[in-house]
């Protein structure tokens, strides 16, 4: 699916953008990363009932911004908060495998901190799982089909075991 927001991700530094006449591209990409962060926070707050995060929460943000930008915002967040034990080791490993835009400014500030998601880390970890799963399914539709096909026999077997125990 094509994202609604088609602003390309800009991977170079602001200094590089300035030297090459691409400063507006840098700024637009950076502002879009911040908007993506805000929309992730908003989606989580609308779809988390205090105990459960709706299964389609990540899908709506991915539809808006696409896999590349959502991955960048989420990975930057986990990398920035890598000390936090509420992020799973799997999500941490994934986050450190994602190529991020250069964030260091000439003054030494990391501009990526502007798009660090501030939602509760345990809930955000669930959102990251959802996003990663949705991205995999979009990249390889067979994954979704296999998951559904594997789940049906397992559910039937569990139901059969429960029925047998009741006898």
Question: What spans do the regions from the language model cover?
Answer:
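Gram-negative host-targeted secretion-system effectors, predominantly Type III and Type IV
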Residues: 1-166
């Amino acid at each position: 699916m094509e994202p609604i927001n088609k602003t390309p991700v800009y991977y170079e530094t602001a200094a590089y953008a300035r030297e090459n006449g691409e400063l507006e591209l840098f700024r637009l990409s950076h502002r879009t990363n911040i908007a993506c962060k805000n929309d992730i926070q908003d989606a989580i707050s609308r779809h988390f009932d205090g105990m459960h995060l709706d299964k389609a929460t990540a899908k709506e943000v991915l539809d808006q911004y696409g896999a590349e930008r959502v991955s960048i915002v989420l990975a930057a967040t986990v990398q920035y908060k890598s000390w936090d034990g509420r992020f799973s080791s799997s999500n941490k490993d994934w986050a450190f495998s994602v190529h991020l835009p250069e964030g260091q400014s000439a003054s030494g500030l990391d501009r990526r901190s502007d798009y660090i998601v501030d939602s509760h880390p345990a809930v955000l970890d669930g959102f990251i799982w959802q996003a990663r799963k949705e991205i995999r399914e979009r990249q390889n539709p067979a994954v979704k089909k296999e998951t559904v096909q594997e789940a049906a026999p397992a559910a039937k077997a569990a139901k059969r075991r429960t029925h047998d125990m009741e006898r």
